Each structure stands twice: as C-alpha cells, then as structure tokens.
C-alpha cells in the first residue's frame, strides 16, 4: 500500500496560537490551522505572523496542515551581518 498523497500549498501566517500552532491563510483564501514540522522544531526555526510558508495538507482533512518550509524574506539582511567588530567570535 502506497503512502497517501499530500497537497503542498503556499500561504501567509496570520496568527501565532498557543502550543506551537499557527493560523495560515492560503493563496486561494482558505484559512487553515497548522503546526511546525519536527525538523523545523529541531532546528529552532522561528515562524512569526506575516511569514510566507509552505504547507502540506492531507487529502483527508483540508483544515489542518504541517508547515515544512519558511520562505526567506527579501527585505531582510543576512543573519547578523551588521555586527560591530567589537563582538566578533573567536
């Protein structure tokens, strides 16, 4: 028996809910509840309101999804590139 197919959709995080849950509006306007995948939690990837994310939805329940990718913001600069030389790591 093959593993069921998952739908991959993009959306924007509207609200960060308690217990590591998120409310996401998909590109087609549907609002779903979502949680961060285990790999994102393991690597301490933060998801904030307004972030663009990729979700996986099961074909059996289209109201819940798993966030498996947070897209990089084009406006943001690199991670800590503007540090003062006084705080350089050794």
From Swiss-Prot:
Gene3D superfamilies: Nucleic acid-binding proteins. Coiled coil: none annotated. GO terms for molecular function: ribosome binding; rRNA binding; translation initiation factor activity. Residues 1-72 form the S1-like domain. Its main location: cytoplasm. It is found in: Cytoplasm. Pfam families: eIF-1a. Keywords: Cytoplasm, Initiation factor, Protein biosynthesis, RNA-binding, rRNA-binding. The keyword rRNA-binding applies. InterPro entries: NA-bd_OB-fold, RNA-binding_domain_S1_IF1, TIF_IF1. The keyword Protein biosynthesis applies. It comes from the Bacteria. GO terms for cellular component: cytosol. SUPFAM superfamilies: Nucleic acid-binding proteins. NCBIfam families: infA. One of the essential components for the initiation of protein synthesis. Stabilizes the binding of IF-2 and IF-3 on the 30S subunit to which N-formylmethionyl-tRNA(fMet) subsequently binds. Helps modulate mRNA selection, yielding the 30S pre-initiation complex (PIC). Upon addition of the 50S ribosomal subunit IF-1, IF-2 and IF-3 are released leaving the mature 70S translation initiation complex. PANTHER family: TRANSLATION INITIATION FACTOR IF-1, CHLOROPLASTIC. Component of the 30S ribosomal translation pre-initiation complex which assembles on the 30S ribosome in the order IF-2 and IF-3, IF-1 and N-formylmethionyl-tRNA(fMet); mRNA recruitment can occur at any time during PIC assembly. Belongs to the IF-1 family. This is Translation initiation factor IF-1 2. The lineage of its organism: Bacteria, Pseudomonadati, Pseudomonadota, Betaproteobacteria, Burkholderiales.
């Amino acid at each position: 028996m093959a593993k069921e197919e998952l739908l991959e959709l993009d959306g924007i995080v509207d609200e960060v809910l308690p217990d590591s849950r998120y409310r996401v509006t998909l590109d087609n306007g549907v609002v779903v509840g979502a949680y961060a995948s285990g790999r994102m939690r393991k690597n301490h990837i933060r998801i904030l309101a307004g972030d663009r994310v990729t979700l996986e939805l099961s074909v059996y329940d289209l109201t819940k999804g798993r966030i498996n990718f947070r897209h990089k913001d084009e406006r943001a600069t690199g991670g800590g590139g503007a540090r003062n030389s006084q705080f350089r790591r050794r």
